[in-house]
């Protein structure tokens, strides 16, 4: 994936210590709408673009005992849609890391919901937005930077935002995925997964739908359906930490 840079320990963009990853693309919609050169990331845009493996970034994050979240920021993460979703998918599925992911976007909430962003097909973009939210435990900061406004404190992020149109929303897990508590069974299934090239050992067909986590179990997570996946490796359980919210 392509990035502009990494800050291993960032304390200015979220209330928890975070790894910050700067994405490399932007349409500079803030400057266009404000009719001037006001972008706070204009210098970053001039920096060289780096090519890195998403797995290396995730492993780097997981090795740091200080950081508790990952912040994906500017330029504009949603203008790198071919890297944004695969990164979060890899974090959740391959590395089984369910830490909070914070996304800073200059798009509005309505633009993202309606697929009015990027250069793609609106229907595809709407599906992309929903697929993103299905991963859960996300915080998304919305809104353009507008110059000459008073900064305000955002309760969700725990930091100051520059324009009064900007705000963050949390998209929590309704359920959470856990490994089966039977460690012997987990070991056995993981050995079979390895032998099977990552495909579900209880399925005959090998395609994207049967790659662990299989599509059927991902749909169960999406719809907050409790229970085990077919092979028994994962269990979707109620996230009791969200009770009463």
Regions found by a protein language model. Name each.
Residues 4-52:
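Canonical Radical SAM [4Fe-4S] cluster-binding loop centered on the CxxxCxxC motif
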Residues 30, 124-130:
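Short, glycine/polar-rich helix-capping loops at beta-to-alpha or helix-loop-helix junctions
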Residues 35-52, 66-80, 97-123, 133, ...:
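Core AdoMet radical
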Residues 57-76, 230-236, 240-242:
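Short Fe-S-cluster ligation motifs
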Residues 88-96:
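Surface-exposed amphipathic alpha-helices with a cationic face
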Residues 166-175:
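Charged phosphate-binding loop/patch that engages nucleotide di/tri-phosphates or the phosphate backbone
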Residues 175-245:
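Long, distal/terminal scaffolding or interaction modules
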């Amino acid at each position: 994936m392509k990035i502009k840079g990494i800050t291993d320990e960032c304390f200015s963009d979220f209330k928890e210590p975070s790894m910050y990853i700067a994405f490399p693309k932007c349409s500079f919609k803030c400057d266009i709408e404000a009719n001037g050169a006001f972008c706070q990331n204009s210098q970053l845009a001039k920096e060289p673009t780096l090519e890195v493996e998403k797995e290396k970034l995730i492993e780097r994050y997981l090795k740091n005992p200080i950081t508790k979240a990952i912040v994906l920021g500017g330029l504009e993460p949603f203008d790198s849609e071919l890297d944004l979703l695969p990164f979060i998918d890899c974090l959740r599925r391959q590395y089984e890391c369910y830490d909070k992911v914070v996304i800073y976007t200059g798009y509005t909430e309505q633009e993202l919901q309606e697929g009015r962003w990027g250069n793609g097909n609106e229907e595809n973009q709407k599906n992309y937005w929903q697929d993103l939210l299905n991963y859960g435990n996300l915080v998304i900061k919305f809104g353009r930077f507008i110059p000459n406004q008073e900064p305000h404190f955002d309760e969700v992020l725990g930091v100051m935002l520059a324009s009064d149109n900007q705000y963050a929303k949390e998209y929590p897990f309704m359920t959470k995925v856990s490994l089966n508590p039977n460690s012997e069974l987990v070991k056995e299934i993981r050995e079979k997964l390895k032998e099977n090239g990552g495909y579900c050992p209880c399925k005959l067909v090998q395609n994207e739908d049967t790659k662990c986590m299989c599509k059927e179990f991902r749909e169960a997570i999406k719809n907050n359906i409790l229970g085990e996946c077919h092979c028994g490796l994962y269990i979707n359980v109620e996230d009791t930490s969200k009770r009463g919210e």
